[in-house]
């Protein structure tokens, strides 16, 4: 049941501090480091926790890592876990692993999620904060030459007038049964799954979601191992946080407001330019992508940066690639 992830994470010394000894650039010092590297120069594999986690299994895995010449480990919750994630038992076992690792000269890194992608805290974020997932995350386009009889399911309706589009969402009665080029946008939602604790993944662009995630995820670690933050608990690994669309254009509730504030014009009547190469589509697409990126930086990366700086923790991991 217990496995070590195939990919080994090699850690360098860039930005590392805490309990690590200062090095010099003398040849003799470097030669000694190559002969017997300190922990920050050694590999640190995933220490996968699944099934029933016990102190005996922790001892075995840490011994295997030490015998293999590793410098630390990332404790990684994975599918199949019986021990409840973020329970009192979970944190007690984590404390045991930290103490055992320190005794053996192995750094322990926190993995910030129950599997991946980071952000939902094993289902606790959507459970505590419904607005993190239930407002829609995408806009799916349907084009038609005649408005349907029922339009309630559409969030935005545009009509092409010459080389521009007019937002007629609140004036549909004037256009019923009138032929034209209509662009109908419907909200799409991230799908619910057992993987996310019966909920869905969350919208990391919604204000407060990352702060809720950090609070729910880290408060248990703060209670049990904070005294080792920046010491034997070296940092945090994040895994594939992302802002992918569940269908259509990526959207979030205050996208249009943030876009206008940043670029000085309204994105809504220009949504077709995100799909069609017409008009000033290159500028609009650039500004749209830049807005999403900046929202991700401001609402995901910066809260984590502040937390890690405040708590003397390093930050590593990898983001999910986007097909933009």
PLM region spans:
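Second-shell loop/turn segments in exported
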Residues: 48-51, 83-86, 200-205, 290-292
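Aromatic-lined carbohydrate-recognition surfaces of secreted/lumenal glycan-active proteins
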Residues: 108-116, 232-240, 292-324
């Amino acid at each position: 049941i217990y496995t070590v992830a195939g990919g080994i994470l090699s850690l360098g010394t860039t930005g590392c501090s805490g309990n690590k000894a200062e090095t010099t650039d003398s040849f003799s010092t470097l030669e000694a480091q190559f002969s017997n590297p300190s922990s920050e120069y050694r590999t640190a594999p995933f220490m996968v926790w699944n099934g029933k986690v016990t102190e005996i299994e922790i001892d075995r895995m840490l011994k295997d890592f030490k015998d293999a010449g590793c410098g630390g480990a990332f404790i990684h919750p994975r599918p199949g876990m019986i021990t409840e994630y973020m329970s009192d038992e979970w944190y007690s076992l984590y404390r045991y692993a930290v103490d055992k690792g320190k005794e053996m000269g192995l750094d322990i890194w926190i993995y910030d999620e129950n599997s991946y992608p980071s952000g939902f805290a094993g289902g606790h974020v959507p459970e505590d904060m419904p607005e993190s997932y239930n407002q829609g995350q995408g806009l799916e386009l349907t084009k038609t030459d005649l408005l349907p009889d029922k339009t309630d399911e559409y969030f935005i309706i545009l009509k092409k007038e010459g080389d521009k589009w007019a937002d007629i969402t609140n004036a549909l009665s004037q256009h019923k049964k009138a032929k034209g080029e209509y662009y109908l946008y419907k909200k799409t939602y991230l799908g619910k799954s057992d993987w996310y604790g019966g909920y869905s993944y969350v919208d990391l662009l919604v204000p407060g979601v990352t702060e809720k995630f950090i609070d729910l995820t880290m408060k248990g670690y703060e209670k049990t191992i904070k005294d080792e933050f920046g010491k034997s608990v070296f940092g945090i690994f994040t895994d594939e946080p992302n802002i992918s669309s569940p269908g259509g254009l990526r959207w979030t509730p205050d996208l249009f407001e943030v876009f206008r504030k940043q670029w000085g014009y309204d994105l809504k009547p220009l949504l077709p330019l995100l799909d069609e190469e017409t008009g000033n589509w290159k500028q609009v697409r650039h500004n749209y992508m830049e807005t999403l990126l900046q929202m991700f930086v401001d609402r995901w990366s910066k809260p984590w940066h502040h937390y890690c700086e405040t708590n003397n923790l390093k930050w590593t991991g990898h983001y999910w690639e986007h097909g933009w």
